[in-house]
């Protein structure tokens, strides 16, 4: 059963400006501890694109859940990692997922300066959302 679909587009220069003003604060606001470890391994030239993709991905996932960031789910509730082939893998905090039946999140990310886009699809193997 389809739970939802979400998409988001982010202008990478917008993130570059935020990083210039708040170099560490912005990353700590939107990234989980696992993502911060990946972020620390990147060269500074890749920081803005990495953050833009994570921001867009988390917005897309929250929209697919039907709520949006700050309306029942937060940036820190969603972790975006990559498997060995680079495929994005989404982890959602149990604080949020306890309300849902088992589900799968499919996420696609793309960037071509100056924009990046994220597209998320959430599906469940059950027809019921627990309340």
From Swiss-Prot:
This is Holo-[acyl-carrier-protein] synthase. Transfers the 4'-phosphopantetheine moiety from coenzyme A to a Ser of acyl-carrier-protein. One of its GO terms (molecular function) is magnesium ion binding. Mg(2+) binds at residues 8, 59. It is an enzyme of class 2 (transferase). Pfam families: ACPS. Keywords: Cytoplasm, Fatty acid biosynthesis, Fatty acid metabolism, Lipid biosynthesis, Lipid metabolism, Magnesium, Metal-binding, Transferase. One of its GO terms (cellular component) is cytoplasm. Its EC number is 2.7.8.7. The gene is acpS. One of its GO terms (biological process) is fatty acid biosynthetic process. It catalyses: apo-[ACP] + CoA = holo-[ACP] + adenosine 3',5'-bisphosphate + H(+). InterPro entries: 4-PPantetheinyl_Trfase_dom, 4-PPantetheinyl_Trfase_dom_sf, ACPS, Ppantetheine-prot_Trfase_dom. Its cofactor is Mg(2+). It is found in: Cytoplasm. Its main location: cytoplasm. The lineage of its organism: Bacteria, Pseudomonadati, Pseudomonadota, Alphaproteobacteria, Rickettsiales. Coiled coil: none annotated. Belongs to the P-Pant transferase superfamily. AcpS family.
């Amino acid at each position: 059963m389809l739970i939802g679909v979400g998409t988001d587009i982010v202008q990478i220069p917008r993130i570059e400006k935020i990083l210039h003003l708040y170099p560490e604060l912005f990353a700590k606001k939107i990234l989980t501890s696992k993502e911060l470890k990946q972020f620390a391994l990147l060269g500074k030239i890749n920081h803005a694109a990495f953050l833009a993709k994570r921001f867009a991905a988390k917005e897309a996932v929250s929209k697919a859940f039907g709520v949006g960031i700050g309306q029942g789910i937060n940036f820190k509730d969603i972790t975006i990692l990559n498997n060995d082939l680079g495929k994005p893998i989404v982890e959602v905090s149990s604080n949020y997922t306890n309300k849902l039946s088992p589900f799968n999140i499919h996420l696609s990310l793309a960037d071509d300066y100056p924009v990046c886009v994220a597209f998320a699809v959430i599906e469940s193997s059950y027809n019921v959302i627990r309340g």
